[in-house]
Amino acid sequence: MSRHSEEFLFLLFSILFIGNTAMAQMQRQWTIRGDTLILYDGQTQQYSVDTPADKGVMSTLISEEQLQQELKDAGIELPKYRRTVKKALPSILQTDRQQYTARLPQNITIRFIAGQRTPNADIYLHFPYGIDVTPDNTFINIIGRGEVPLRQLPQQSAGRYGDRLSYQQVGQYSLKDNGAHGKVLHLKGIDLRILNKYDVVLSIKGVSIEQKKYQLEAWYTTKEPQPLMSEKTQVQIEGVNRIADLKRLPYCRNTFSEEFLPTTAEFTWTADPEHPYTELLISTDSAATWSTVRNLDKEEYLNEMYVTGLEPGHLYAFCMDVKEGPYQGRSNVEWFYSGMLNVKKYGVRGDGQYDDTDRLNQLITDMSAHGGGTLYFPEGTYPVRTLVMQSNVWLFLSEGATLQAIPGALPPEFTWYSDKDYRSGLSPTDPKPYRDPDNYLTKQDVGHTYFYNAMFVGERIENVKILGNGRITGNGNIVTGDKVMNNEPHRRCDKMFSFKLCNNIEIGGFTGKEDLWYDEKTDEPYYLKGDSIDTDISNMLRIDQGGHFVLLATGTDYVYMHDTYFGKEKQNNVRDIYDFMACNNVRVENIYSRVGSDDIVKLGSDCSLGFTRKAKDYSVRNIIGDTNCNLFQIGSETADDISEVYVDNIYVLGANKAGFSISTNDGATVSNIFLNSGKTGRLHHRSVMKRTRTPFFLSISNRGRVIGAHAEMFSFKENNRQRNELLITNIPIGKVENISLQGVDISEVYGGSSFRSDRWKAFDGSQKESTAIIAGYKLPDDQQIDGGLSFVLPDSCHTRYLRNISFKDISMTVKGGHPKKDASAMPPELGVGKYNVGDFQIQPAYGFWFRHVDGLTVENCSVNCEKPDQRYGLVLDDVKNDVLHNLSFPGKKNRKWIQRK
């Protein structure tokens, strides 16, 4: 086989693997060298969602049938000789480009992916002499944890975890200088059981290389289930005497109108400051012929420039032509498709019958490879299974365009662990989620654990937008249930949009209008236009039947969701709307959800990445909707801290749980959460809550579902009731601090969502209703537990108070009607896996019930009852440092207003 064929083979497997992580965890089970086929015979551990829990260990030796098929698919004849070696599967090694401008400082980015999963890996990267790698100029990102200087790798945070976790350090390194033979970077103790697209990303900053070729090498060792070493994988780069880093910068903007048409190209490069005279060349015939578009001199540019007025609908090529000096000659070529590419002109049918998935994925891949651009969907219906999104590609849906899910989405990923110990449930007695402290799959519900079984998926990509005023529908083919993996393989899609460790994601309609609000008479949203209203909502993106998640964004930053109408055409097959797990810098605004079965905006942090990640900086405004759960929720997944969350202008049409909920259960600190502070923009109305089982639900429990956690069964008495339940022994109780809620009008306090019901059924006494609940958490005392309490939590705190909680300017009218005996109700402490309103049973107050709170302000609040209620208006149970001012409760027919315990 020729060298070209070998390179093609490597590229083929690289593309298959990088483009679709879900399809295989073992890549390249064979290699061809000359006339010899090399087969790798070792062991790995790998589970699909169907693999029995004890059957994950498997051989890496490819079967003869599969080998023949792969050779056939690659167009390669079976080589003359065959050899089997006892090696780990080869790794993949990539650089961001093949050529670099010689003698000018540039960054070199290297990506490494081990051929198979393993704990406690050793990874070796060899850099030839001339590529100067140091602990200070090299930055490293291990499995997506975030980039840090190499020198700081041993100190990088491993996230939040319990002391039973095997790996409490991201890794260590050594850098051996072999003089003229280069340097070897040795990464030690790397946990590669998790696959987040790339295992290691290295960025070497400001490197100057000479005009020559350099060969980089990488290899690694496995520890389990069998100690193995891989062969060396090589990649070659070259220093050249020409500009090699001309780059077209992708469009990045957060406003998108119907008239948007990208016709400007922006470029950057590293220029030689001594020889500035350069021309920018343009080609309209795929780089066959060139003409000058700009003459540049030193005063006209600083390593960047724009080209404007390009004709839409054309593919342009650009390059630099340096006229003098050591870099004289033409640079690398960059591409730009001006305007938007009409997908129907490139083989996509959009006829509602033909499966357009493969052609659309090819267009997305091609557009990304050419630097990005916008795909335009004209009127039509486009059936798709899974669209694999790529960096810098935008989708524009015209008003008559419908993207429609069909069966056959990508399967869930292969994983090192089995998830069968826990996929869903709320049991306080089930120890299986904690059985293996390292198994990150069992620390959250199955819907959060897998990412590729989605209608749209992206992993470690950036600058992706799905915009317009068309429609996206799951069409009944996206599953809502927790038992999704019991379905046939082609029916396991449970997410519409799934983004994992991405940056700069936007989904929504056309922007430019003002604030969205709601008209009770028409039961429709409208836009505010100054002091008037605008009932034209045709700018909104329409989404329906989104499955378990319309959006699951995990470890994804700079997210913008806006101007979307959920459920206009169909209201079934929808559960959560927006789930943000461990995301930062998120904006959500102008959202209307006609009805759904779960949270509309939900924030959390889980273990699905194999590590935890903090969540911070949220701006949420103008959210209107009806839900079977909560309109706004923090939790239940709270494996890491969540802070700086600003919510303004919410309108709850119905909620069978809470209008506004904060629930920390897994040890995280939730802090600095504000409702109606005005931080996100204008407070155009008071917030409204109607038909909520409870308006507010703030709670703490110690479920402790985080990697490294340990749980034991205990028997104890509480309120004269025997409880036999799990208690978490090594995870601190979470915190809720600095919460300010104000400016809300609340009425019809009962679970009155129209989910699977009339719109809306009036209160008849059968619906569930609760007080505003604000409750910390206390472990049972030593004397309450049979045999005593056998552990002390890491911070020695066994009662966690909510701290600095403020309610101001709240007007509430409740149903009332409770008898005198309910005033003596003693709600239980929340057990493991219990975090819902109903778990507190009946409360002794009809207005606010506070327990385990330190630092409380209730000011300018009023509570009224439709019927006399024999409970207290406000109960303070184990509350410290409270300030109550200007409160109003009903008169003589009700009991005493306030009770202190």
Question: What name fits each language-model region?
Answer:
Residues 16-17, 25, 81-901:
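Extracellular/periplasmic carbohydrate-active domains that bind, remodel
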Residues 33-68, 77-79, 99-116, 204:
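N-terminal targeting signals for Sec/Tat export/insertion, comprising classic cleavable signal peptides
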Residues 25-31:
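Cleaved targeting-peptide boundary
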Residues 10-19:
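Bacterial N-terminal signal peptides
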Residues 1-9:
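Bacterial N-terminal signal peptides that target proteins for export
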